A protein has these predicted regions:
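C-terminal structural segments of small proteins and small subunits
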Residues: 72, 77-97
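Short S/T/G/P-rich N-terminal loop/turn motif that feeds into the first structured element of a domain
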Residues: 1-57, 62-74, 98-115
Length: 115
């Protein structure tokens, strides 16, 4: 299992794709230049199965530590990325910082065999 921190950007469904598509490359250019970025993930929501919040997309930026994540957000590229995502969503996105733990199925099965 491994552990890191991620910045989660949740974009609501009422933000139109044409608006996102117009400046999304600019956002990615800035976000992907943030110091300490280890990896990135993007998920377009296909179907909402339950809940009140309708979501268009979840974009995640992964960092080794919380301090590195915070420093990246305050970096020049982080500030530019933040400004662009604010403009793209008219401030309607949700930003979360989360601890991310991940494991692969083979390791999980090892625990099941020991039960």
């Amino acid at each position: 299992m491994w552990f890191m921190y991620k910045l989660m950007i949740i974009i609501p469904a009422d933000i139109e794709d044409p608006m996102l598509n117009a400046r999304w490359p600019d956002f990615l250019r800035a976000a992907e230049s943030m110091p300490g970025l280890l990896r990135e993930a993007n998920a377009r929501v296909v179907t909402s199965l339950f809940g009140d919040q309708q979501i268009n997309m979840v974009h995640e930026l992964f960092f080794e530590t919380l301090i590195v994540l915070q420093e990246a957000m305050q970096s020049p590229d982080g500030l530019i990325a933040g400004q662009i995502i604010q403009e793209l969503t008219q401030g309607q996105m949700t930003l979360l910082v989360a601890e991310h733990r991940e494991d692969d199925i083979d390791n999980l099965r090892n625990y099941q065999q020991n039960d």
